[in-house]
Amino acid sequence: MKQFIGKGLCATLLAVAFANAQAATAHALEVSSEAIIDAPQAEVWNAFTSRAGVESWMVAKASIDLRLGGLMRTHYRKEGELGDDGTIENTFLSFDAPRMYSMRISKPPATFPFANAWKTVWTVVYFDPVETGRTRVTIRMLGYGDDKESQEMRAFFAFGNQYTLDMLAAKYKAVLPAKKPAAQ
């Protein structure tokens, strides 16, 4: 009987250790950034999903076709043109307005330093009302590999996504990060 209990306990401990290792690995394969924005959910949704909204705080130029398979094309340079080699193209995978949308990089800019890692990641952006007139925005990027290039890109977006949220918070004059990304 003791031997049976000992084997059962050992199996349970191994299962818990395996689950914890998987959870730690999964965390290393994603980026999560969030901020509380001093604006209502519908307004923040519009700031992310309309050309005028995105151009008011994030990029110099944009075109957004918010539908399944539609493109979000953005350009950070005023002198650039949508469609040139500096354009970033993302394809919408899903959306539930005004709560969330997901997208995948379909064409990075020509100077993007990560030749292959972008091909496996996708982004989910959540918009949660937290109190009257305020919205929690969470950006999660998933699908990173454990290879060097993918982890370098993960660090790039850990900084970049939080910077993006900080810019949005500044637009609404409430620089209140809910949490910073984990140390890289």
Annotate each language-model stretch with its function:
Residues 33-35, 61, 87-94, 120-129:
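Hydrophobic/aromatic beta-strand elements that line small-molecule binding cavities or substrate pockets
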Residues 1-10:
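Bacterial N-terminal signal peptides that target proteins for export
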Residues 15-22:
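C-terminal segment of classical bacterial N-terminal signal peptides
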Residues 170-184:
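Short, highly charged C-terminal tails/helix-capping segments
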Residues 111-159:
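Beta-strand/loop substructures that line and gate deep hydrophobic ligand-binding cavities in soluble
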Residues 38-57:
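Amphipathic alpha-helical segments
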Residues 38-42, 66, 93-101, 126-136, ...:
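A short, structured loop/turn motif at beta-sheet edges
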Residues 52-87:
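Short beta-edge strand/loop motif at the mouth of beta-sheet-based domains
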